[in-house]
Amino acid sequence: MSIKYIASSKLPTPWGVFEMHGFEDSETGKEHVALTLGVFDAESPILGRIHSECLTGDALFSLRCDCGFQLQTAMQNIAEAGQGFILYLRQEGRGIGLLNKIRAYELQDGGANTVEANERLGFAADMRKYDMIIPMMEQIGISKVRLMTNNPRKVKAMQSFGLEVVERVPLQVGKNRYNEGYLKTKSTELGHMMSEHHFTEEGKD
């Protein structure tokens, strides 16, 4: 495995002081981060999330997606539980990178949905991989998870690596008039498990 643990430090946030653990992929050069809060019992399921980098949503407060809302809600949920983790993976734009994501947004501005835009650029709908989570989870000492996600691929990925997903915790947050179509596409074409209320006009916040 090409993932190497580098260092850890404290990370004060609005939701508490997390521990930040840095990892480097020697093959790709990408740097991944695990955030942890609290003390873990190896036999108890720990609340957590696998979160793929989204500069536009996480840092620039974009309303085109639900990523930033999911990250903040996950951190808040972990703080309320008193323990938990987030694996922050550098897989911008479902794995196509930031500039290609902007190209995809340009196509979406012209009427394509998020899947069609990726495919027109020559990419699969979702290019992400999750094998890097194995050494990350080993380093932070977690094998049983209550996973905050709407994406069944993340559940299957964890299970395929021998991690026990005791519960899937839905994260249906961040719906607004700019991302209703995006959320619907994630549900109908990417298989994300969301209630229809979360992406329909009738369920508008």
UniProtKB/Swiss-Prot annotation:
Residues at the active site: D126 (proton acceptor), R128 (nucleophile)
Source taxon at top rank: Bacteria
Matches recorded under InterPro entries: GTP_cyclohydro_II (IPR032677), RibA (IPR000926), RibA-like_sf (IPR036144)
Record: residues binding Zn(2+): C54, C65, C67
GO biological process: riboflavin biosynthetic process
Database matches in SUPFAM superfamilies: RibA-like
Cofactor: Zn(2+)
GO cellular component terms attached to this protein's record: cytosol
GO molecular function, one term: GTP binding
Pathway of action: Cofactor biosynthesis; riboflavin biosynthesis; 5-amino-6-(D-ribitylamino)uracil from GTP: step 1/4
UniProt KW Nucleotide-binding keyword: yes
Record-listed E.C. numbers: 3.5.4.25
EC category: hydrolase
Cofactor detail note: Binds 1 zinc ion per subunit.
Keyword terms of this UniProt record: GTP-binding, Hydrolase, Metal-binding, Nucleotide-binding, Riboflavin biosynthesis, Zinc
Catalytic activity, reaction form: GTP + 4 H2O = 2,5-diamino-6-hydroxy-4-(5-phosphoribosylamino)-pyrimidine + formate + 2 phosphate + 3 H(+)
Binding residue positions for GTP: R49, I50, H51, S52, E53, Q70, E92, G93, R94, T114, T149, K154
Function: Catalyzes the conversion of GTP to 2,5-diamino-6-ribosylamino-4(3H)-pyrimidinone 5'-phosphate (DARP), formate and pyrophosphate.
Family that this chain belongs to: Belongs to the GTP cyclohydrolase II family.
PANTHER family: 3,4-DIHYDROXY-2-BUTANONE 4-PHOSPHATE SYNTHASE, GTP CYCLOHYDROLASE II-RELATED
NCBIfam families assigned: PRK00393.1, ribA
Name recorded for this polypeptide: GTP cyclohydrolase-2
Gene, per the UniProt record: ribA
